[in-house]
A protein has these predicted regions:
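Loop-to-transmembrane-helix entry motif
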Residues: 33-47, 71-79, 109, 113, ...
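Juxtamembrane helix-boundary/capping and inter-helix hinge elements in multi-pass membrane proteins
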Residues: 18-24, 32, 63, 98-102, ...
Length: 288
């Protein structure tokens, strides 16, 4: 399975560099297949609540309420891990790399983070993320328009973390002995699959089935965590968006953008709005 993922990444990379008509035709075919598969996936997701109810009811009937305690520990473990990554590691990275207060960037990103949490979709949040980073954090359009769309696809911090914890939890539930080599393979597979995960709700479940197959577990084992997935999906999406914005701010500062996080959010919005009006006026004058 790991070899298939690596091959897919290389195939996609070299297909993107192929500029011939046949290369474009192949890209169109693959894109069409992707669109169809996503529609099928969304149809299946619509019936997920019914399936989750049946799975949980059957499990509780067989084992009693004892099955709920491990699931609660799994839920708590993921929340703590996401919290440490978002509120400890990321703020330290901002402070060290930008020499600015992390609280200022957190305040700037609140609208985007709330939208990401409620929608559970990085793609749906992307326009608001770009607006917050540009107008409230002071990052240039040139930097944010390059980093954020790319990050929404390949920089899935929360997703990769969740996939690792979920795969290990399911493996332990099935009584699988996780050697150090197996754990390392889970981490690598989670990192690679998180790169290609679609920015839509519940897309991580597809990636987890890939990881389960890589360690010899059946795909239906994912039913063990479906009951908690919606809430955790909202949390990890917010972490994904937060991670993208942090990388953008750090990169902007490394490129010499001194205005990044240099002013309070209210003042930054005024400055960026005024600058935007000035740029449009200058462009209009040149055209006239």
């Amino acid at each position: 399975m790991l070899g298939l993922i690596v091959f897919s990444l290389l195939f996609g990379f070299f297909l993107r560099t192929e500029r011939s008509p046949s290369g474009q035709s192949l890209r169109n075919i693959i894109d069409g297949i992707y669109q169809v598969v996503m529609k099928i996936t969304m149809l299946v997701i619509r019936f997920t609540p019914l399936g989750v109810f049946a799975l949980i009811a059957a499990t509780v009937t067989r084992t009693g309420m004892d099955a709920i305690e491990p699931l609660a520990w799994f839920f708590l473990t993921v929340l703590v891990a996401l919290g440490l990554h978002a509120f400890v590691f990321m703020p330290i990275l901002i402070a060290l790399a930008t020499k600015r207060s992390p609280l200022r960037h957190i305040q700037a990103m609140i609208p985007a983070l709330l939208t990401a949490f409620s929608s559970a979709s990085s793609a749906a949040t992307l326009p608001l993320t770009m607006e917050c980073v540009q107008k409230r954090s002071g990052v240039s359009t040139r930097t944010s328009s390059f980093v954020l769309p790319l990050g929404a696809t390949v920089n899935m911090d929360g997703t990769a973390l969740y996939e690792c914890v979920a795969a290990m939890f399911i493996a332990q539930a099935y009584g699988l002995d996780l050697s150090l080599t197996t754990q390392f393979m889970i981490v690598i597979t989670a990192l690679l699959t998180s790169i290609g995960v679609a920015s839509i709700p519940a897309a991580s479940l597809v990636a987890i089935t890939v990881i389960l197959g890589a360690i010899g577990l059946p795909a239906e084992a994912i039913g063990l965590i479906l009951v908690t997935d919606r809430v955790l999906d909202m949390c990890r999406t917010a972490v994904n968006v937060w991670g993208d914005s942090v990388v953008t701010v750090v990169l902007a500062r490394s490129e010499g953008e001194e205005q990044v996080l240099s002013l309070p959010v209210s003042e930054m919005e005024t400055v960026t709005t005024t600058a935007g009006h000035a740029d449009r006026d200058a462009t209009a004058s040149e055209q006239s």
